[in-house]
């Protein structure tokens, strides 16, 4: 250990922070699309570790670490190679690192080599060697290991059952028997009568040592968290999917603590099992949370692309879920916790996480489930782990009915069948209320006939930041169509939004304005089979003319309007006018704005326009689509300069304006919400034929 101290270079903290901010790694973080919060992690990079010098002198790879210092595990690192590297390269790179370290008098312990999940390896080494490792060929980035934690601090079964189907006994549409659920948790008491014969405890185990030399490993303590969650998923009496089979992987120790690296190895174990013996629908339950981790999110993305459904706890820190992993991974279904009154769960001074990275909430307080104290004992537990277990069970029920559902289709159905607008949003911080979904998970009333529905969801971007040229970007899942794009700014200063192609996919971009506090981009993402969509743009016109963007191709219908403008005064004093025609085929905008029409062709697709305006400025104006129609586009028709933006909440278009009492405005001009509502006759007909 003395060698480590003698070789370390100490930098003055202000100079070190300046080097970090100016370094190329910071620029790379802004460009990376694996997670919007990566720059937060990079900003906290190695303040006192002497790593800034390494990142400035020839290192093409980047270094990442947990933003929460107490959770960091210095000395253990995940080295991730570039995607195009050969399968043999991880071992070769590890051996090269070991050889070069040995020449410098250091020993490196190779703990694990990743092949099937991502190319890379796990090593234990001195942090003095990070400069050397970052300069190795083929290395993409290195992440310091960090801790993850269990997230647990029969009203619940009644709550997830649709109201008109409730009876004295919980009766889901099916038992989820076609689905296999992997649980990454503590060990499990497989002999408990709730789960006996339903759980297979695998031989996998990768856990850190418990803290403290006097910790006594009682079986009941070591098994408690995993046993309870296994019972919530598939227990005979208290389970959601009573027929689902469950496989247990131990990644948390007896204190409910694990590491990012252990979780990665567990996920790779699942991927290997899937490759060796492909099974039907597969759900992975991740009832744990740690600080934001690029490598853990990347692993979840790889597994999701292989057809695995991942369900994760949002976290119990009463904080933005986007700051934690795996909750922040876009490919993961992230679940917050509510109580019996459908309100957010409070756990002492903490509580459920929230924000745009949460997909929905589920029962997570005083949940009765199997106890590891004895084979017939039950116990009540609370937390987002319990909430995630409910959604994993609901997913098993849905997948048993429709085994071919993709992740995007399953997520859309979970959102569609949830109870809506039942959570008191005042519990959340004010700036998070508009971003947090007001959805509580529920079983579908029937597992048949849902295919006729045109499913859409709203995806919010991360906040752009306050600089004049700042942009925000929202994107849909690969299987979804981006049917419209809108923007929102709490200050009202923005330069509109547009849809742009990036990397073969369309994304929604929103633009901040001078003096603004930042902007959000809001994408409307839909499942539209056999769709052919395109964007038609009308550039700024003459001073006395408006702009019109048309859907001129035969059979194409308008699904959304957007506009952006470069002149600051236009955004401040003359916002663009977006009004689809009587037949939704064109978008009309202000003469100084570029107006964009999203036009789509799909079998049986039909759309119409709904508009609702008020004669004087209001803080909020809404218009909703009728039952059977789905909102695809939402925009504002303003006659005032105080529009904050427009966004979709379920099938309702919401237009927000600044509080007139605070702006001093005396304008009497109307504000209108304009909705484009669509449906697919083709999907409805196909569903009826199947029935």
Swiss-Prot record:
<dbReference type="InterPro" id="IPR041051">
    <property type="entry name" value="PCSK9_C3"/>
</dbReference>
<dbReference type="InterPro" id="IPR010259">
    <property type="entry name" value="S8pro/Inhibitor_I9"/>
</dbReference>
<comment type="similarity">
    <text>Belongs to the peptidase S8 family.</text>
</comment>
<keyword id="KW-0967">Endosome</keyword>
<keyword id="KW-0645">Protease</keyword>
<dbReference type="GO" id="GO:0005886">
    <property type="term" value="C:plasma membrane"/>
</dbReference>
<dbReference type="GO" id="GO:0002092">
    <property type="term" value="P:positive regulation of receptor internalization"/>
</dbReference>
<dbReference type="GO" id="GO:0010989">
    <property type="term" value="P:negative regulation of low-density lipoprotein particle clearance"/>
</dbReference>
<keyword id="KW-0458">Lysosome</keyword>
<dbReference type="Pfam" id="PF18463">
    <property type="entry name" value="PCSK9_C3"/>
</dbReference>
<dbReference type="GO" id="GO:0070326">
    <property type="term" value="F:very-low-density lipoprotein particle receptor binding"/>
</dbReference>
<feature type="signal peptide">
    <location>
        <begin position="1"/>
        <end position="29"/>
    </location>
</feature>
<feature type="modified residue" description="Phosphoserine">
    <location>
        <position position="46"/>
    </location>
</feature>
<dbReference type="GO" id="GO:0005794">
    <property type="term" value="C:Golgi apparatus"/>
</dbReference>
<feature type="glycosylation site" description="N-linked (GlcNAc...) asparagine">
    <location>
        <position position="532"/>
    </location>
</feature>
<keyword id="KW-0068">Autocatalytic cleavage</keyword>
<dbReference type="GO" id="GO:0030182">
    <property type="term" value="P:neuron differentiation"/>
</dbReference>
<feature type="disulfide bond">
    <location>
        <begin position="476"/>
        <end position="525"/>
    </location>
</feature>
<feature type="disulfide bond">
    <location>
        <begin position="222"/>
        <end position="254"/>
    </location>
</feature>
<keyword id="KW-0443">Lipid metabolism</keyword>
<keyword id="KW-0753">Steroid metabolism</keyword>
<keyword id="KW-0720">Serine protease</keyword>
<dbReference type="GO" id="GO:0008203">
    <property type="term" value="P:cholesterol metabolic process"/>
</dbReference>
<dbReference type="InterPro" id="IPR015500">
    <property type="entry name" value="Peptidase_S8_subtilisin-rel"/>
</dbReference>
<dbReference type="GO" id="GO:0030169">
    <property type="term" value="F:low-density lipoprotein particle binding"/>
</dbReference>
<dbReference type="GO" id="GO:0001889">
    <property type="term" value="P:liver development"/>
</dbReference>
<dbReference type="GO" id="GO:0032805">
    <property type="term" value="P:positive regulation of low-density lipoprotein particle receptor catabolic process"/>
</dbReference>
<dbReference type="GO" id="GO:0005783">
    <property type="term" value="C:endoplasmic reticulum"/>
</dbReference>
<dbReference type="GO" id="GO:0007041">
    <property type="term" value="P:lysosomal transport"/>
</dbReference>
<dbReference type="Pfam" id="PF05922">
    <property type="entry name" value="Inhibitor_I9"/>
</dbReference>
<dbReference type="GO" id="GO:0043525">
    <property type="term" value="P:positive regulation of neuron apoptotic process"/>
</dbReference>
<keyword id="KW-0597">Phosphoprotein</keyword>
<dbReference type="GO" id="GO:0034190">
    <property type="term" value="F:apolipoprotein receptor binding"/>
</dbReference>
<dbReference type="GO" id="GO:0001920">
    <property type="term" value="P:negative regulation of receptor recycling"/>
</dbReference>
<keyword id="KW-1015">Disulfide bond</keyword>
<dbReference type="GO" id="GO:1905601">
    <property type="term" value="P:negative regulation of receptor-mediated endocytosis involved in cholesterol transport"/>
</dbReference>
<feature type="disulfide bond">
    <location>
        <begin position="625"/>
        <end position="677"/>
    </location>
</feature>
<dbReference type="GO" id="GO:0034185">
    <property type="term" value="F:apolipoprotein binding"/>
</dbReference>
<keyword id="KW-1207">Sterol metabolism</keyword>
<feature type="disulfide bond">
    <location>
        <begin position="485"/>
        <end position="508"/>
    </location>
</feature>
<dbReference type="GO" id="GO:0050750">
    <property type="term" value="F:low-density lipoprotein particle receptor binding"/>
</dbReference>
<keyword id="KW-0378">Hydrolase</keyword>
